[in-house]
C-alpha cells in the first residue's frame, strides 16, 4: 500500500521541489496543492486562506505553503502564514489526523546580533526580526492543539535551482553593479544554509520516521563565511565582484530609513534594501545539528555539491 503524502505550497520553491523529487517513486502517492496554476501531475489549485476539502485522504501532510518574504503587510503575512495554517490543521482534523509536518523558518530565533549553535530549545520571541518570522511562529503555536503526530521543521537559508529569494536577489544586484562589499565587521560573518534537495530528503525522512521530536532545525551542518561564499559564486558565474565598500552599520541605518519611507508613504513593492537582508551579512547565525543528525541522518547532498549544482543551473538560465 502506498504512503499518501500531501504537500502544500507545491507551486512554490520548497513544495514544488518536493513534489518533483518524489512524485512517481515506488510506494508513494503524492499530491500537491497551491494557490497558483501549476502543470505538475496530481496538483490541485486551492486557496489555503479558505477552508478546503479534497476527495483524497493523506497519511502525511507537509505544510510548506507560506508567504516567504522579508517585506509585506501584516494582513498578507497573517493570511498566508497563520490563517492558511489554521485551515490546513482543520483539513487534517477532518481527515483522520494524518502526520503533520509544519515547515516553519529558522528566522523565528533571530535577533539583531550574532547567534551561534542555536538549538531547537533556544528561546523564541517575544520580539521578532520581521513580521514573516513572527507569523511563522504564530503558525507553529497553532499546532499545539492538533491531536495527530506532528513536528515543526525549521530550515535555514534554503538555496538551489528554483530559488527566488536567497541568491537571486544578490545576483540581480551584482549584475546591475549595485551590490556593495560589506566592511566593518569585527569578525567574519558565518552562517548555515541548506540545499533544496537535502531539505526535500529531510522532509521525506520526517514523513516516514517511526518517531519524531517536537521540532528540528534543518541545515547542511556546515557553516560558511557568507560574504566569501557569495564572492565565490559571483566569480564562478563571471559576474562583476562588488567594489564599493559600505560599512555594515551604515547599511543597517540606510535600510531603516528606506523601510520607514516605504511604510510612511505606503509605497508598493519591496524596498531595495531591508534590515533583514543586510542582517544576513551583519550577524552570524549557526545551528546545533545534533538532534537532526541523530534522528534524521546526515544531509543527502553536501554543501559544496549543492553550490556546484546551483551555479550550473543559474548559468544555464542565461544561455
Write out the residue ranges for each language-model feature:
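NAD(P)-dependent short-chain dehydrogenase/reductase
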Residues: 146-152, 156-198, 233
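Mid/C-terminal beta-alpha module of Rossmann-like enzyme folds, strongest
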Residues: 202-270, 308-311, 318-319
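Catalytic helix-loop patch of NAD(P)-dependent Rossmann-fold dehydrogenases
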Residues: 114-159, 163
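N-terminal Rossmann NAD(P)H-binding glycine-rich loop of SDR-like oxidoreductase domains
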Residues: 5-24
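Amphipathic terminal alpha-helices
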Residues: 287-319
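NAD(P)H-binding glycine-rich loop region in Rossmannoid oxidoreductase-like domains
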Residues: 45-83, 87, 91-94, 111
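Conserved Rossmann-fold NAD(P)-dependent oxidoreductase catalytic core, especially the SDR/UDP-sugar
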Residues: 87-131
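Conserved C-terminal active-site "lid" loop/helix of NAD(P)H-dependent oxidoreductases
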Residues: 196, 231, 254-299
Amino acid at each position: 500500500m502506498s504512503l499518501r503524502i500531501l504537500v502544500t505550497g507545491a507551486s512554490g520553491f520548497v513544495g514544488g521541489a518536493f513534489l518533483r523529487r518524489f512524485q512517481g517513486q515506488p510506494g508513494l502517492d503524492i499530491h500537491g496543492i497551491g494557490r497558483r496554476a501549476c502543470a505538475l501531475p496530481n496538483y490541485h489549485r486551492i486557496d489555503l486562506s479558505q477552508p478546503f476539502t479534497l476527495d483524497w485522504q493523506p497519511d502525511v501532510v507537509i505544510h510548506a505553503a507560506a508567504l516567504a518574504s522579508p517585506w509585506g503587510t501584516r494582513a498578507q503575512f497573517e493570511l498566508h502564514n497563520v490563517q492558511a495554517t489554521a485551515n490546513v490543521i482543520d483539513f487534517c482534523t477532518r481527515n483522520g489526523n494524518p502526520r503533520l509536518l509544519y515547515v516553519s523558518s529558522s528566522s523565528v530565533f533571530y535577533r539583531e546580533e550574532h547567534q551561534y549553535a542555536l538549538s531547537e530549545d533556544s528561546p523564541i520571541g517575544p520580539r521578532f526580526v520581521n513580521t514573516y518570522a513572527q507569523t511563522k511562529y504564530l503558525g507553529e503555536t497553532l499546532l499545539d492543539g492538533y491531536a495527530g503526530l506532528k513536528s515543526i521543521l525549521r530550515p535555514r537559508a534554503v538555496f538551489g535551482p528554483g530559488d527566488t529569494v536567497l541568491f537571486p536577489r544578490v545576483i540581480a544586484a551584482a549584475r546591475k553593479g549595485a551590490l556593495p562589499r560589506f566592511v566593518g565587521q569585527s569578525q567574519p560573518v558565518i552562517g548555515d544554509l541548506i540545499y533544496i534537495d537535502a531539505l526535500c530528503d529531510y522532509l521525506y525522512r520526517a514523513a516516514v520516521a517511526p518517531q519524531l521530536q517536537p521540532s528540528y532545525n534543518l541545515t547542511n551542518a556546515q557553516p560558511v563565511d557568507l560574504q566569501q561564499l557569495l564572492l565565490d559564486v559571483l566569480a564562478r558565474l563571471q559576474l562583476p565582484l562588488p567594489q564599493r565598500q559600505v560599512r555594515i552599520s551604515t547599511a543597517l541605518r540606510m535600510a531603516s530609513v528606506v523601510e520607514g519611507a516605504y511604510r510612511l508613504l505606503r509605497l508598493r513593492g519591496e524596498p531595495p534594501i531591508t534590515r533583514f537582508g543586510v542582517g544576513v551579512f551583519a550577524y552570524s547565525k549557526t545551528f546545533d545539528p545534533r538532534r537532526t543528525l541523530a534522528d534524521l541522518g546526515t544531509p543527502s547532498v553536501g554543501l559544496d555539491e549543492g553550490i556546484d549544482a546551483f551555479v550550473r543551473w543559474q548559468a544555464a538560465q542565461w544561455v
